[in-house]
Amino acid sequence: MNRIDEISTKSKEMILSRLKDSYKIAGFESSNSIDPVEHVQTTNNPLEEMKQKMSDNKYIVHECDPSALEDTINEIVASYGYSKMIYGSGLNLNLDKINASSKICFDKPIEELRADVFHREFSIVHAEYGVSSHGVALLKSSQAQPRMLSLAPNLCIVLLKKDRVKNSLASALNALKADQNGKLPSNILFIAGPSRTAD
């Protein structure tokens, strides 16, 4: 073993050893961080604030009853003249009611669907939560709802239940963490409007 390999091996072992030891802090107790939204000017109506701030972020917000969801989606898609849809396996909508000449489920690796993904005109995704203080939708990227669904098509329809609006990023993340048995997912998207996605 040459000197460089020897130093690299020692460094690697030292770093890994420190990482293992860092998780064993005696007496450490996790606590929720202070919510910085206290410093943001908000209203007493998170839903209305959410809709206003989403509109400010260039979302086109539509409100509808669950019974009219597919009809509302069809109206939106028709207004753009789109007919090629891509969706995740976890969509949980009646796809027979969605007017699209072509519907592709994103349930395979991107390498197998690359040509289809980038030639789809619209997608439909579920948001886990909305954040009223920022007007953003929080999505959990997963195999059932790949991140690419919100990026590749020209139009991404984000479905958000009214009772899933939180007043801050911290409260939305804490709620998602509670939903996930105390652990956050490895990939979370905050969508703030067209071409404004952060993970």
List the predicted regions and their residue ranges.
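The feature marks the mature, well-folded catalytic cores of soluble enzymes
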Residues: 1-199
